[in-house]
């Protein structure tokens, strides 16, 4: 009776009745138990109603259980309001969404307080997000209807918030609108939706990209009101209403950084300034961005007029060489972003990875830029519509249109499903096979392999079409006649040729080439090498011309040649492998640290031609195996140390090169740096133990362990990280003297051993040093012994250590020790970290430490990513503070890695989700940029003097359109992080 009563009023338009075959269950038993467990906690009438719908519609039941299993975000929406779930399932989704928007507009129109508006918009977002997700998961709406619904939701939310703010300003007498109910009309305030929002293609957890402009002679402004402060204040209010994190969530994250020069301009710009900027300084990527621009709120008439004025900037009537070169440069920059990453499944980024969504969008937008000036029909916003018109006008084949369209729809669906898991703006697939197995089921596949087959097929087809976009030589240089590269700076034909390739200093390059071709360097004295090199020079010059700074690349290669004693094999390698040469050019141009390493040890290039180079990063087991091979036949202790240094430098070079080329995520690189260091530390530990014992013998019952602290402990190392180490030992008290020819007493033995260990790392040989070692984190720092006995270490941590030492201990990790001794040390550390603490005392100590660091290091330099206010130190302190305060009652919070500790704190409810969604992306941004800066900059980073190649690599690492946008993002991020630090820990003047 209950079942029939509940379902009798449903018709076939109801969302519940329209579910088709959707997700599959990864663990059906666990999923069913989780769903049933939630139902059991509900009021009986609610539980019965939801259960009846599930029983009546089996596909719906599986989808709901799949959400419980795979999507914490959607399951939270469901659990947060069972009545909302019933309301969504029982109605027709098209009518329900329209009613939601209508009701919200009615409520906001009557609201008198900003808090009421914020609450109403968040209620709207929560129900609409659940409804749209269910329509996507259940196959009720095709993917582009889903994106349009998300776009409509965003656009109406922006308009509602803006209308409220302008109504408030009208009430204060600052504007006099002709229509008080629609105060935006005739206001001269223009809100442009950019990117996917502009094209009606918004993804599930997307930021909304907006640019706000205003007319200087805004007709509705009161006479005494200055336009800029007024419109900036309104824009800030708009951003606050939409994106401020509260207990009831947020509406949309707002990104205002696509405006002209965002690092130095206010959040709202006059149309006069905008037009002047686009005319004088507008870049090709900004032209591409404007293809999708659409007035979405504010004065729509003024918005359309502004786009008409901007149109000549976007749509050029004639395609000159410079424009074509810009388009080609956009493609090169994107290739640099992707590096040479293989198409993959685990961890693949379906937006910017090979064969991804960005390549489809770029494929369409590039040809729109090229032809849209003469063919107005190409001036459309949606990607699929552009592909359709390009095919109809024979710019692309019907096959290209069909394959790219099908791939786009598939990849957008995958992207949505990834984002539904945790409502994060991510585009990367899970990075383990097990996680992909579960994700595949959530997407409706029966296995990881069946999903992988489809995914790889689409990615490969997209990549194939994308690769053909600039088939041949777009600059026309291949058609130039051959020249004499050794003719010198007097040969005008050579100079013209170098200019045509893009060199800015042809006289200097011609002089360098003349030196090469006459065999003036040691490496070129051998006739066969010189002959091979001469044949190779034209290809070399053409390839180096593709570098970001071609003249600097030639100079760097020249330094490499001068440093070589014997280089025939290197010349041969580069002549036969153009991809290798491109990579070497990037290294030489952007990372002097790596370039110097290459000049000293050219044999490290061998690693770049290993097929494994562009595959997965080697794990610890593989690194250990490689290290064992490197050391296998070393004959002496000194040779062991030399080979260790060579192994370390080659590993650093290979990881650094992968960071530069964009072929490994920087977080994986950080782990790889740590794995290399850990493998070397373990090897040195064993080697020094044996070598030391041969002279001094051993102490009865002796055990030694190396405790990694800092970046090695947390596995967050960079190319320039030193090793923060503590040596811990123990032995039998009844026989404290060693049994060697030169006997030492207990503590003296281990102190001498530790000094020998440090020397093995820091002694400079022909191959440099292994690592700088810092032992100041040991008990009592420099004043204490260099090695600590375990009981003394435990007593110090328990009775004497300062709060900062316990903060540092959250990163402590035993990396070399016998298993039983390792366990004893870990027990000591865990006991210290999980003891009960006074939160107020810890917060005060942390705030005081932050103030002291600010006084010593300063915190005003935005690009000091570690120490700036709101920088990485703030995030580290937050993670460490949460661990010390909460580990007593929630020991699962503990983790040596900052991001993992934040994840644990969020999962355990000890860090608000809203704060986590600021801190985690901030930490990733800082780590991404820090990896680049540690590779490429030895002194303080100054963007005003940095080379364009470095700036481009940083822009790529920060996933920004240009450096100005990146700088604006860093500033905004630091402000947000500092606000959280001040709220959680205090010390607003920290």
UniProtKB/Swiss-Prot annotation:
HAMAP family: GlnE
Family per record: Belongs to the GlnE family.
Example of a GO biological process term: regulation of glutamine family amino acid metabolic process
GO annotations of cellular component type: cytosol
Reported cofactor(s): Mg(2+)
Gene Ontology MF term list: [glutamate-ammonia-ligase] adenylyltransferase activity; [glutamine synthetase]-adenylyl-L-tyrosine phosphorylase activity; ATP binding; magnesium ion binding
Region listing for Adenylyl transferase, in residue ranges: 478-990
Lineage top rank: taxon: Bacteria
Sequence segments annotated as region (Adenylyl removase): 1-474
Protein name: Bifunctional glutamine synthetase adenylyltransferase/adenylyl-removing enzyme
Top-tier EC class: transferase
EC number(s) given by UniProt: 2.7.7.89, 2.7.7.42
Keyword line: ATP-binding, Magnesium, Multifunctional enzyme, Nucleotide-binding, Nucleotidyltransferase, Transferase
Catalytic activity: [glutamine synthetase]-O(4)-(5'-adenylyl)-L-tyrosine + phosphate = [glutamine synthetase]-L-tyrosine + ADP; [glutamine synthetase]-L-tyrosine + ATP = [glutamine synthetase]-O(4)-(5'-adenylyl)-L-tyrosine + diphosphate
InterPro entries per UniProt: GlnE, GlnE_rpt_dom, NT_sf, PII_UdlTrfase/GS_AdlTrfase
CDD domains: NT_GlnE_GlnD_like
Physiological role: Involved in the regulation of glutamine synthetase GlnA, a key enzyme in the process to assimilate ammonia. When cellular nitrogen levels are high, the C-terminal adenylyl transferase (AT) inactivates GlnA by covalent transfer of an adenylyl group from ATP to specific tyrosine residue of GlnA, thus reducing its activity. Conversely, when nitrogen levels are low, the N-terminal adenylyl removase (AR) activates GlnA by removing the adenylyl group by phosphorolysis, increasing its activity.
Pfam families according to UniProt: GlnD_UR_UTase (PF08335), GlnE (PF03710)
Protein's UniProt keywords contain Cell membrane: no
């Amino acid at each position: 009776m209950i079942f029939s009563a509940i379902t009798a009023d449903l018709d076939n338009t109801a969302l519940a009745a329209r579910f088709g075959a959707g997700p599959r269950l990864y663990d059906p038993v666990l999923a069913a138990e989780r769903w049933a467990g939630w139902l059991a906690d509900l009021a009986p009438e609610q539980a019965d109603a939801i259960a009846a719908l599930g029983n009546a519609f089996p596909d719906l039941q599986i989808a709901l259980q799949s959400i419980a299993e795979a999507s914490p975000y959607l399951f939270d929406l469901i659990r947060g309001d069972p009545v909302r779930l019933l309301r969504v399932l029982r109605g027709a989704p098209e009518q329900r969404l329209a009613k939601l928007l209508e009701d919200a507009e009615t409520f906001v129109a009557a609201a008198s307080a900003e808090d009421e508006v914020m609450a109403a918009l968040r209620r709207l977002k929560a129900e609409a997000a659940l409804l749209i997700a269910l329509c996507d998961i259940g196959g009720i709406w095709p993917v582009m209807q889903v994106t349009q619904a998300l776009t409509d939701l965003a656009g109406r939310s922006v308009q509602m918030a803006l209308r409220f703010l302008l109504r408030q300003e009208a009430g204060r007498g600052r504007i006099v609108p002709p229509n008080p109910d629609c105060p935006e009309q005739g206001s001269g305030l223009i809100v442009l939706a950019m990117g996917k929002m502009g094209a009606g293609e918004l993804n599930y957890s997307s930021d909304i990209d907006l640019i706000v402009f205003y007319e200087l002679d805004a007709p509705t402004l009161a006479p005494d009101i200055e336009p800029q402060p007024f419109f900036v204040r309104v824009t800030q209010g708009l951003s606050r209403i939409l994106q401020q994190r509260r207990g009831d969530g947020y509406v949309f994250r707002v990104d205002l950084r696509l405006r002209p020069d965002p690092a130095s301009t206010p959040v709202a710009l006059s149309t006069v300034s905008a037009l002047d900027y686009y005319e004088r300084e507008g870049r090709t990527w900004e032209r591409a961005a404007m293809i999708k621009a659409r007035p979405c709120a504010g004065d729509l008439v003024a918005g359309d007029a502004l786009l008409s004025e901007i149109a000549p900037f976007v749509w050029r009537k004639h395609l000159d060489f410079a424009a074509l070169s810009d388009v080609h440069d956009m493609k090169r920059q994107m290739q640099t972003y992707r590096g040479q990453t293989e198409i993959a499944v685990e961890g693949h980024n379906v937006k910017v990875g090979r064969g991804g969504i960005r390549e489809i969008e770029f494929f369409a937008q590039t040809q729109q830029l090229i032809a849209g000036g003469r063919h107005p029909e190409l001036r459309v916003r949606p990607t699929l519509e552009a592909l359709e018109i390009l095919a109809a006008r024979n710019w692309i084949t019907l096959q290209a249109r069909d394959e790219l369209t099908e791939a786009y729809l598939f990849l957008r669906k995958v992207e949505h499903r990834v984002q539904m898991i945790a409502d994060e703006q991510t585009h990367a697939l899970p990075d383990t096979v097990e996680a992909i197995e579960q994700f595949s089921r959530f997407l409706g596949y029966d296995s990881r392999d069946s999903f992988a087959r489809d995914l790889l097929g689409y990615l490969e087809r997209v990549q194939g079409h994308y690769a053909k976009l600039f088939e041949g030589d777009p600059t026309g240089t291949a058609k130039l006649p051959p020249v004499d590269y050794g003719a010198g700076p007097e040969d005008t034909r050579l100079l013209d040729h170098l200019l045509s390739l893009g060199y800015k200093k042809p006289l200097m390059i011609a002089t360098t080439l003349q030196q090469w071709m006459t065999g003036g360097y040691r490496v070129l004295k051998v006739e066969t090498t010189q002959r091979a090199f001469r044949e190779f020079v034209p290809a070399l010059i053409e390839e180096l011309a593709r570098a970001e700074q071609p003249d600097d690349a030639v100079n760097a290669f020249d330094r490499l040649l001068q440093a070589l004693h014997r280089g025939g094999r290197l010349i041969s390698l580069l002549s036969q492998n153009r991809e290798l040469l491109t990579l070497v050019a990037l290294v030489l141009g952007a990372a002097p640290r790596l370039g110097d390493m290459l000049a000293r040890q050219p044999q490290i290039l061998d690693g770049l031609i290993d097929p494994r180079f562009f595959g997965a990063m080697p794990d610890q087991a593989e690194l250990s195996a490689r290290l064992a091979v490197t050391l296998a036949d070393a004959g002496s202790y000194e040779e062991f140390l030399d080979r260790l240094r060579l192994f370390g430098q080659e590993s650093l070079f290979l990881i650094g090169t992968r960071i530069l080329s964009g072929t490994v995520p920087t977080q994986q690189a950080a782990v790889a740096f740590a794995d290399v260091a850990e493998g070397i530390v373990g090897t040195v530990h064993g080697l020094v133990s044996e070598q030391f014992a041969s002279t001094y013998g051993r102490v009865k019952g002796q055990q030694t362990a190396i405790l990694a602290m800092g970046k090695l402990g947390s596995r967050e190392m960079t190319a320039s990280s030193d090793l923060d180490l503590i040596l811990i030992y123990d032995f039998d008290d009844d026989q404290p003297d060693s049994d060697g020819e030169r006997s030492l007493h207990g503590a003296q033995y281990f102190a001498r051993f530790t000094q020998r260990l440090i020397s093995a790392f820091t002694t400079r040989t022909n191959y440099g040093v292994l690592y700088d070692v810092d032992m100041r984190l040991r008990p009592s720092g420099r004043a204490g012994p260099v090695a600590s006995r375990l009981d003394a270490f435990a007593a110090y941590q328990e009775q004497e250590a300062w709060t900062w030492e316990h903060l540092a201990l959250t990163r402590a990790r035993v990396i070399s020790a016998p298993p039983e001794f390792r366990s004893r040390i870990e027990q000591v550390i865990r006991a210290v970290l999980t003891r009960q603490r006074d939160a107020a005392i810890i917060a005060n100590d942390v705030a005081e430490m932050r103030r002291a660091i600010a006084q010593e290091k300063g915190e005003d330099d935005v690009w000091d990513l570690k120490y700036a206010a709101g920088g990485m130190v703030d995030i580290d302190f937050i993670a460490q503070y949460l661990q010390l305060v909460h580990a007593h009652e929630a020991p699962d919070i503990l983790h040596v890695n900052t991001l993992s500790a934040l994840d644990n704190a969020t999962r355990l409810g000890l860090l608000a989700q809203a704060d986590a969604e600021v801190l985690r992306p901030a930490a990733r941004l800082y780590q991404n940029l820090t990896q680049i800066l540690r590779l490429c900059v030895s002194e303080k980073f100054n963007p005003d003097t940095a080379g364009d190649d470095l700036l481009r690599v940083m822009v790529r690492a920060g996933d920004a359109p240009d450096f100005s946008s990146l700088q604006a993002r860093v500033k905004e991020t630091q402000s947000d992080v500092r606000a959280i630090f001040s709220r959680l820990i205090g010390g607003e003047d920290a």
